[in-house]
């Protein structure tokens, strides 16, 4: 027999038939691997060619011992099956199961049959296009298949595996729209369609749950069941722009699979009987899922992979056709015999630090930033009692007919219903021209008109910034319709309409610019270090946002600048930003203390005197220690001036509103098309509106007047001669907005009003969070308690991971030594895959690491093109509102005043305390940054091993507007203020240890044990568990031909 002759070493070589379309055969990866196989000298490669495959009968096809055959466009799979049945070669990839790969339904069914995790999904099968199916329901924000509901965002895939037109539909709360994913065309792999809301109906589709993966996809490539190579790439979901290197190739980076993922790779390979097989992996919330199986796939541009694949395929073919031959690899791989040995030098450490450094030994380990949202429109609220039948019926329609239940209207359908009802109730007269003598009726009609104007604003609806509450107040008993007894019916309800507070075009630009600044200045690597870290999974990034739309969009715009993304914000928001309302929203925990502070503040402002306790320290040395610090001494006089100037501006806007043509909003039945830019915040200045003398954005003069008249009325009640100082921040907010965005309206006295409002707001706003340091600390700790606890968890986890790396290095050296000695005694190739059960032993740091509930993956450091391969940087970004910024800052600056910490020095130096006292406002995009550095030169037990650097920025800078120069003119033209750079909160050269930081703020932070428990997926033993990490390195870095791999190209 031929193979017996081959076994003696003098017969024919093992013939490997390549029955593949020429386009695939002559691809670079296939050529690299086949050339390596042939260089072993044991194989003869037979290329069938397109003519033979397509035209010749199978009987005349070359006879081979091993067959490489896989389906591609135009490939006659049936012929290949007939040939295999006739000649019975060893099949590298089985042919029969390749039919499964053409139907995504069968792929998912097969994966589930083998217990391989897949996303939650459901199938919609149509026999003809546009067929109505009783089990399929579509609503505005979800689809339902056989009773199973999929909320947006969800994914829609054609069941045809060769159709790559995949859609992702986004919820209305994020602006709606659809993103289409497709095979790469040039530099694009997806496109966003903001107007598409309804799903496709022309065929059969799979609907599956969208999984947030941090904007990165993982591609896994198996070569037999015991080898898997994984790469990361930027997900097309984010912005659809393909990242390419200088050679024009898509940028991909090797990553290490977890033990569970390695087992999944093995099972995919076995389940589909495809030795060479590529599949897509989704990593989401600590779990991994297979979402697509592609069949025959090779890695591109990885010489390490080409080496591995050739070695594994060689062993497979020898085991199948010559099992008595040794499959031990030669000491030097044949294709590396003539290559020079390359040096491993050049991986040097890079020092980092804004405030001083420990030299070349210091490494940045963690960046934590708490950021306020960007520039927004003024927040508005309209309250009115309604008795109109149409509005009461509307309330009953959406609260289930319950007479005492309130209802919230947010969706487009609900708001359209309200608009229709309101249009029929609003008098057709213009503001300021009413003849009605009843003041209450006049005010009611004015508020109804305001509600109508708000609902018509922009010509669309978006729950992200407009919502209405209807709460019943009075009821009467009426006979039931069937005459059987009585029932309650509401006759009066309170309507509360909240609107405004939308991120402006300027706010979006500010956030994106700040993200770009962080990328270039907060991380080592000359501006590109962060992007390399992120792409290689060595940048552990999480972005959190409160529930408010302006905060979410600020986070998305910041991420766009930070990661150098392109495209619309909605896909970035859904892919990268996690909402955490309990941590970043709300003031409920401190509402009692804040009311007390406001009452005391009102007393100080309206009485005209400052109240300083006798036992307080000298206000000259520590001015921030006095009650009401920062309030102007003549606050009472300024308050009356504020009222007068506010009335003056309001009257000017009233005259503009009187001249506004109401016909702009008619005819009522025509609604302009949906505009995502307006729903989520304008992306650009509407130059035409401004040129025609209209207010910036979509606000008309009627709404502008409503904004100012409400401020004037609420600020001062003439009948009771009573001031409401809580309106001062709102007056300042409105004034600042119009000064920046509506300067072209030339409102007389606006500049003067702004100066007075700023003086008062600079004193009032900080004191609303506590009238003195002790109260500021108490209120701050209640508002920011959960956020402070999360920050401590972030810092602690980073420290534990860094310490594990240091300990791991010693283990690696021992493993290297052991591996080398054991390799000398081996007579056969060791497994390239280690059973996952061996990798699931828990590590010592698991419990601590699980507290954070965050997924952690490891980079294959050997192939990372970075200066310091061991560097792993954790970034946590928390986007929130002004209240949380003030609260966190107050905890940091006053924590040493707590009784439990008496005698401790402040975390913030005296110089910084003085600057903070003068920094009255933490404006839009203000931020606090904590950076954690590790000094690897000191011992692991030394407190100086980890130091914290604290910086802050007061955000948008108004000062340039005071100058009548070119810069001021440009800022006014662009409506965008610059963001102040970071300022130090510690002395240069000082060292705030992590240990000290934890001790000082722990009393004001939520304990780690109070956070929800983390769920660890089966087989995932933590980020740096020692046993798993060491074996993981062994699998990926130390093959039995390691002694020659240093010659390889990478």
Curated annotation (Swiss-Prot):
Which residue stretches, if any, does this entry annotate as coiled coil?
none
Q: Which reaction does it catalyse?
A: 1D-myo-inositol hexakisphosphate + ATP = 1-diphospho-1D-myo-inositol 2,3,4,5,6-pentakisphosphate + ADP; 5-diphospho-1D-myo-inositol 1,2,3,4,6-pentakisphosphate + ATP + H(+) = 1,5-bis(diphospho)-1D-myo-inositol 2,3,4,6-tetrakisphosphate + ADP
Q: Name one GO cellular component term.
A: cytosol
Query: Which compartments is it annotated to reside in?
Result: Cytoplasm, Cytosol
Where on this chain does substrate bind?
23-24, 183-184, 219, 233, 297-300
Ligand binding (ATP): 104, 157, 164, 183, 208-211, 217-219, 235, 280, 292-294
Enzyme Commission number(s) from the entry: 2.7.4.24
N-acetylmethionine: modified positions: 1
- Has the keyword Phosphoprotein been applied to this entry? yes
**What are its GO biological-process terms?**
defense response to fungus; inositol metabolic process; inositol phosphate biosynthetic process; jasmonic acid and ethylene-dependent systemic resistance; positive regulation of antifungal innate immune response; positive regulation of defense response to insect; positive regulation of vitamin E biosynthetic process
Record SUPFAM superfamilies: Glutathione synthetase ATP-binding domain-like, Phosphoglycerate mutase-like
Renumbered to this chain, region (Disordered) spans 817-855
According to the UniProt record, list the residues that bear Phosphoserine: 821
Annotated region (Polyphosphoinositide-binding domain) at: 355-429
What tissues is it present in? Mostly expressed in vegetative tissues (e.g. leaves and stems), and, to a lower extent, in roots, shoots and reproductive tissues (e.g. flowers and siliques). Also present in mature pollen.
Sorted alphabetically, which keywords does the UniProt record give? Acetylation, ATP-binding, Cytoplasm, Jasmonic acid signaling pathway, Kinase, Nucleotide-binding, Phosphoprotein, Plant defense, Transferase
- Give the disruption phenotype, in one or two sentences: Abnormal accumulation of InsP7 and reduced levels of InsP8. Increased weight increase of P.rapae and M.brassicae larvae feeded on mutant plants thus leading to a reduced resistance. Increased susceptibility to the necrotrophic fungi B.cinerea and A.brassicicola. Increased levels of jasmonic acid (JA) and bioactive conjugates such as JA-Leu/Ile and JA-Val upon mechanical wounding, but reduced induction of JA-responsive genes in challenged mutant plants.
Show the ranges annotated as biased composition (Basic and acidic residues).
837-846
State the superkingdom. Eukaryota
Molecular function terms in GO for this entry?
A: 5-diphosphoinositol pentakisphosphate 1-kinase activity; ATP binding; diphosphoinositol pentakisphosphate kinase activity; inositol hexakisphosphate 1-kinase activity; inositol hexakisphosphate kinase activity
Q: Which family does it belong to?
A: Belongs to the histidine acid phosphatase family. VIP1 subfamily.
Any idea what job this protein has? Bifunctional inositol kinase that acts in concert with the IP6K kinases to synthesize the diphosphate group-containing inositol pyrophosphates diphosphoinositol pentakisphosphate, PP-InsP5, and bis-diphosphoinositol tetrakisphosphate, (PP)2-InsP4. PP-InsP5 and (PP)2-InsP4, also respectively called InsP7 and InsP8, may regulate a variety of cellular processes, including apoptosis, vesicle trafficking, cytoskeletal dynamics, and exocytosis. Phosphorylates inositol hexakisphosphate (InsP6) at position 1 to produce PP-InsP5 which is in turn phosphorylated by IP6Ks to produce (PP)2-InsP4.
Name of this protein: Inositol hexakisphosphate and diphosphoinositol-pentakisphosphate kinase VIP1
Organism field: Arabidopsis thaliana
Question: What lineage, starting at the top, does this entry show?
Answer: Eukaryota, Viridiplantae, Streptophyta, Embryophyta, Tracheophyta
What's the name of its gene?
VIP1
């Amino acid at each position: 027999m031929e193979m017996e002759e081959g076994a003696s070493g003098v017969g024919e070589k093992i013939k490997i038939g390549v029955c593949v379309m020429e386009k695939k055969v002559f691809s670079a990866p296939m050529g690299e691997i086949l050339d390596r196989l042939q260089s072993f000298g044991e194989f003869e490669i037979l290329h069938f060619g397109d003519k033979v495959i397509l035209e010749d009968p199978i009987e005349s096809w070359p006879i081979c011992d091993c067959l490489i055959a896989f389906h591609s466009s135009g490939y006659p799979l049936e012929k290949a099956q007939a040939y295999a049945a006739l000649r019975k070669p060893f099949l590298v990839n089985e042919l029969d199961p390749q039919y499964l790969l053409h139907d995504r339904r069968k792929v998912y069914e097969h994966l589930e049959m083998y217990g391989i995790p897949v996303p939650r999904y459901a199938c919609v099968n149509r026999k003809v296009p546009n067929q109505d199916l009783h089990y399929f329901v579509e609503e505005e924000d979800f689809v339902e298949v056989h009773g199973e509901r999929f909320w947006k965002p969800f994914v829609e895939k054609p069941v045809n595996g060769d159709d790559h037109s995949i859609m992702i539909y986004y919820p209305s709360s994020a602006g709606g729209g659809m993103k289409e994913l497709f095979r790469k065309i040039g530099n694009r792999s997806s496109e966003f369609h903001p107007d598409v809301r309804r799903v496709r109906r022309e065929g059969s589709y799979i609907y599956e749950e969208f999984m947030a993966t941090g904007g990165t996809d993982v591609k896994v490539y198996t070569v037999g069941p015991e080898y898997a190579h994984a790469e990361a790439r930027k997900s097309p979901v984010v912005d659809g722009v393909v990242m390419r290197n200088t050679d024009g190739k898509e940028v991909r980076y090797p990553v290490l699979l977890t033990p569970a993922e390695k087992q999944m790779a093995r099972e995919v390979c076995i389940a589909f009987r495809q030795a060479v097989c590529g599949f897509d992996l989704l990593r989401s919330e600590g779990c991994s899922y297979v979402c697509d199986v592609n069949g025959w796939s090779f890695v591109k541009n990885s010489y390490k992979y080409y080496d591995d694949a050739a070695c594994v395929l060689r062993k497979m073919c020898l085991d199948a056709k010559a099992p008595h031959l040794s499959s031990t690899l030669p000491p030097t791989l044949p294709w590396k015999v003539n290559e020079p040995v390359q040096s491993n030098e050049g991986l040097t450490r890079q020092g980092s630090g804004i405030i001083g450094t420990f030299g070349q030994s210091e490494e940045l380990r963690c960046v934590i930033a708490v950021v306020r949202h960007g520039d927004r429109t003024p927040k508005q609220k309209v309250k009115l009692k309604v008795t109109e039948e149409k509005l009461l019926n509307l309330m009953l329609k959406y609260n289930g007919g319950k007479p005492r239940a309130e209802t919230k209207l947010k969706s487009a359908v609900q708001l359209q219903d309200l608009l229709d009802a309101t249009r029929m109730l609003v008098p057709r007269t213009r503001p300021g021209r009413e003849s009605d003598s009843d003041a209450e009726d006049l005010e009611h009609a004015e508020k109804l008109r305001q509600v109508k104007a708000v609902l018509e604003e922009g010509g669309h609806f978006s729950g992200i910034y407009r919502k209405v509450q209807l709460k019943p107040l009075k009821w009467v008993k009426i006979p039931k319709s069937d005459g059987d007894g009585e029932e309650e019916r509401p006759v009066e309800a309170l309507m509360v309409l909240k609107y405004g507070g939308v991120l402006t075009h300027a706010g979006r630009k500010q956030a994106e610019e700040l993200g770009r600044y962080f990328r270039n200045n907060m991380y080592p690597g000359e501006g590109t270090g962060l992007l390399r870290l992120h792409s290689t999974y060595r940048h552990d990034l999480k972005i959190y946002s409160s529930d408010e739309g302006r905060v979410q969009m600020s986070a998305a715009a910041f991420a766009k600048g930070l990661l150098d993304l392109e495209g619309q914000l909605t896909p970035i928001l859904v892919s990268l930003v996690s909402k955490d309302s309990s941590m970043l929203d709300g003031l409920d925990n401190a509402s009692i203390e804040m009311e007390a502070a406001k009452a005391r503040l009102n007393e100080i402002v309206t009485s005209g005197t400052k109240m300083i306790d006798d036992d307080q320290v000298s206000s000259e040395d520590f001015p921030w220690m006095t009650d009401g610090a920062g309030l102007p001494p003549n606050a009472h006089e300024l308050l009356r001036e504020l009222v007068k100037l506010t009335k003056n501006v309001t009257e000017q806007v009233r005259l503009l509103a009187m001249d506004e043509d109401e016909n702009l909003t008619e005819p009522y039945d025509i609604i302009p098309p949906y505009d995502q830019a307006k729903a989520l915040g304008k992306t650009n200045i509407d130059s035409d509106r401004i040129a025609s003398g209209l207010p910036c954005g979509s606000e008309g003069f009627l709404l502008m007047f409503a904004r100012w008249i409400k401020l004037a009325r609420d600020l001062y009640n003439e009948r009771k001669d009573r001031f409401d100082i809580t309106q001062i921040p709102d007056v300042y907010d409105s004034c600042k907005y119009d000064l920046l965005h509506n300067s072209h309206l030339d409102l007389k006295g606006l500049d003067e009003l702004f100066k007075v409002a700023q003086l008062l707001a600079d004193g009032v706003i900080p004191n609303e969070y506590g009238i003195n340091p002790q109260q500021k600390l108490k209120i701050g700790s209640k508002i920011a308690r959960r956020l402070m606890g999360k920050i401590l968890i972030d810092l602690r986890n980073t420290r534990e991971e860094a310490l594990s790396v240091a300990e791991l290095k010693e283990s690696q050296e021992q493993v290297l030594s052991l591996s080398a000695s054991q390799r000398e005694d081996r007579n056969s190739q060791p497994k390239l895959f280690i059973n996952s059960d061996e990798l699931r032993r828990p590590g010592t740091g698991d419990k601590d690491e699980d507290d954070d509930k965050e997924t952690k993956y490891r980079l294959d450091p050997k192939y990372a093109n970075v200066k310091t391969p061991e560097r792993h940087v954790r970034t946590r970004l928390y986007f929130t509102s002004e209240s949380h910024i003030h609260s966190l800052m107050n905890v940091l600056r006053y924590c040493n005043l707590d009784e439990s910490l008496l005698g401790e020095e402040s975390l913030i130096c005296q110089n910084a305390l003085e600057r903070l006292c003068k920094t009255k406002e933490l404006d839009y995009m203000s931020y606090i940054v904590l950076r954690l550095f590790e000094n690897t030169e000191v011992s692991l037990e030394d407190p100086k091993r980890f130091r914290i650097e604290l910086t802050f920025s007061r955000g948008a800078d108004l000062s340039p507007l005071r100058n009548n120069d070119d810069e001021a003119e440009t800022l006014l033209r662009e409506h965008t203020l610059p963001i102040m750079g970071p300022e130090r909160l510690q002395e240069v050269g000082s060292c705030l240890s992590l240990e000290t930081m934890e001790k000082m703020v722990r009393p004001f932070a939520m304990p780690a044990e109070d956070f929800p428990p983390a769920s660890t997926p089966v087989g995932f033993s933590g980020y740096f568990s020692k046993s798993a990490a060491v074996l993981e390195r062994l699998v990926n870095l130390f093959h039995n031909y390691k002694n020659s791999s240093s010659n390889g190209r990478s």
